[in-house]
Amino acid sequence: MEDSPTMVRVDSPTMVRGENQVSPCQGRRCFPKALGYVTGDMKELANQLKDKPVVLQFIDWILRGISQVVFVNNPVSGILILVGLLVQNPWWALTGWLGTVVSTLMALLLSQDRSLIASGLYGYNATLVGVLMAVFSDKGDYFWWLLLPVCAMSMTCPIFSSALNSMLSKWDLPVFTLPFNMALSMYLSATGHYNPFFPAKLVIPITTAPNISWSDLSALELLKSIPVGVGQIYGCDNPWTGGIFLGAILLSSPLMCLHAAIGSLLGIAAGLSLSAPFEDIYFGLWGFNSSLACIAMGGMFMALTWQTHLLALGCALFTAYLGVGMANFMAEVGLPACTWPFCLATLLFLIMTTKNSNIYKMPLSKVTYPEENRIFYLQAKKRMVESPL
């Protein structure tokens, strides 16, 4: 990502009284400073690493790539997300990490924009590819031969990303997780459930009406499905993992964390409104696409105002309903819906035009995180008022 707020360092002189010295950074004053260093997009760390060994820079790129799945450009958040994946399943964490590494190396070999690589934008799609290939593998955990197709499909992600960016940049639109959707759909279509080497889990369409009893609805399970919905962005159904992911998002941006939770909640509401099987709702299948959509529209690619906040809620609901339609459609050919609903719905909302000045689409080159995006929007609005011509 691009700009971030400038951190101002204030050093107080050391006070010497006899033999006692008072540190310039003590207790409560030091903590906010340290916290400010690890929040947002940690641009200061990226700048400090520019003259450091390339191995340290590469680790930073990988961690940012892991966190960019949820639009977070923060290596500490990447560490937390990796911890969450380890809590869910160490094998999934390994395949996701491997996919990110291979994709980032491939982007370097293809001489892609170094600033985009450093922000993790050539790694996050392969993170999902690696994790979801393990999730959908019918061979179970630690099927080591799976690492070969994980590497192969991860290498396609920078190609998809670069090609899609060439097209979508004409409208100043992001590629989102379209490369992941393309790569995973291609892999699952080529292998399928009956492949002797790399069989995938069987995806079948619904052929009978679900037996819904509203008296069986559990408020506790619905509450747990909020973090589970966020966790399902990475294919995880553990509520503790989802909670760790929310914490990782919170570290970078409280506004993003809020919209992630709201989006998951709206997905649950959409599922209940269509009498979806409770197991699907508890499993987070109704929450992850709407959570991504709510984050994207709620301050990330649209400057946050009350108007865009309401637009984000509408986009989240629209995404949830589109998701069940696409899931039913794609199940006919044995494929999961992945994050196709999020990509298509959110791109549709971003393309939308309006004369309302409070609905402001962020220039893609200026997108950082919601709090900083809003500062940019207010400054741009002030400049327009001061010099309308």
Curated annotation (Swiss-Prot):
Gene3D superfamilies: Ammonium transporter AmtB like domains. It is a multi-pass membrane protein. The chain crosses the membrane at residues 53-73, 91-110, 116-136, 143-163, 173-193, 242-262, 281-301, 310-330, 333-353. The keyword Transmembrane applies. Glycans are attached at residue 211. Keywords: Blood group antigen, Cell membrane, Glycoprotein, Membrane, Transmembrane, Transmembrane helix, Transport. The keyword rRNA-binding does not apply. It catalyses: urea(in) = urea(out). Pfam families: UT. Homotrimer; each subunit contains a pore through which urea permeates. Identified in a complex with STOM. Belongs to the urea transporter family. Mediates the transport of urea driven by a concentration gradient across the cell membrane of erythrocytes. Also mediates the transport of urea across the cell membrane of the renal inner medullary collecting duct which is critical to the urinary concentrating mechanism. Facilitates water transport in erythrocytes. This is Urea transporter 1. It comes from Homo sapiens (Human). The lineage of its organism: Eukaryota, Metazoa, Chordata, Craniata, Vertebrata.
